[in-house]
Structure formats: structure tokens, C-alpha cells
Amino acid sequence: MIETSDFITPESEEELFERIEPLQANGITSLSYLVVREGKQFFMKQLRPEHKDNPRYILIFKKEFAIGQRISHPNIVDYKEIGENSEGIYILTEYVTGETVEEKLANDPDYFRNNINLDNFFRQLLDALGCLHSHNIVYCDLKPANIMLTRINNNVKIIDLGFCDTDDYAFSAGMSENYAAPEQLQKASNKLDTRTDIYALGRLLQHIEKRRGRRLPSK
């Protein structure tokens, strides 16, 4: 569990960051920024002003960072630090330059039509999920928007661990309906396990194959 003493609390944002640039990748409860410190870029996720004093959302942020700190894998975004400034709690992760899977499908429709690219994508994704599962973490929100392909080499990066389910933080698991397993749709959080992610992986494959002009069996 993260205690208050673990937070970085500068007197002002200017003392910590050289540049803060808003991004469009905002969530329902959070805002996103590209920040620069000592010449290096980071992704900053911060609670929206209307939620910054909400104990539940603060705990969810702490949960996300605690999970991120447990994981070290080349295909999962690297969590750097958690802190607090005049706008409230924030999380810093590595800044990934590239595209989400959904953006890749739209901007480069031939990419996944190449079987080597497709195989490489799913091998890396499975390896990343295997790492999470080996730490008793269920990702719970596998979808095209939460998977990036890096600009160089198109390496997989799973981003946003905010909806992960663990034994310690099971109450805050989330989902995206189009990729949610039946137990998620039924709000049966006590039934979530690694198979929940495998179901979403199948839905993701189905989505990509459809965009490739192919169809997988529905059953």
C-alpha cells in the first residue's frame, strides 16, 4: 500500500516539469498530459478537478501505481512515480511514441494483413499478459485503445493498468463492453480470473480479423 510519504510534493509544477502539454487521450475520471523533465518526456495522468478530492478515485490511482510498480516487462508501459501538485494526485509513466491498435488499423490497414506482423503482435501481447497473470493480476480491459504499437519496430505496449483486478484491489475492476467477458457483464467480480483476459483476447483477434477482411467463427 502506498503511504502519503511516498508522494513527491513539489512547491509548484514549474519546479518539477519544464513543459506540460495537454493530450487528447483523456479518460472519464482523468486528464492526460505530455510532460518534460530534464529533457525527457513522460506521460502524466491526473484526476479531473471534480474528482481530485474523491477518496475512491484517489485510492484507484494509488492502486494503479502500486500494480505498475510490481511489473517490469518490455511490452507493458513502465510506471515511474506517483505525486501530487496543486491540481491533485498524478501518475507518471514512460511516454510511448506510436499508435494504438485502433489507430494502426485505420492508418495502416495493410499492417495486420501481413501474417508475420500479426503473429509478432499476438506473441508479444500474450507474453505481456502472461507476465501480469504470473503476478496474479487480471488486466480486465483489453481493447484496441489500450494497446499501443511503438513508432520504431511496432513493439507492443499495454498501457493503462487502472482497471486491473488483483486480490488486494478487486473492487475497482472495470471493463469495456465490446470486449468484456460474460462474468464482467454480469458484475460477478468474484469470478474474474485469467480467463477473463483470454476472452477479451479472442474478441480482439476477432476484431482484427474482421478488419483484415476475414471472419472467425462466432462460437
Segments (PLM) and residue ranges:
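Activation-segment/catalytic-loop signature of the eukaryotic protein kinase fold
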Residues: I82
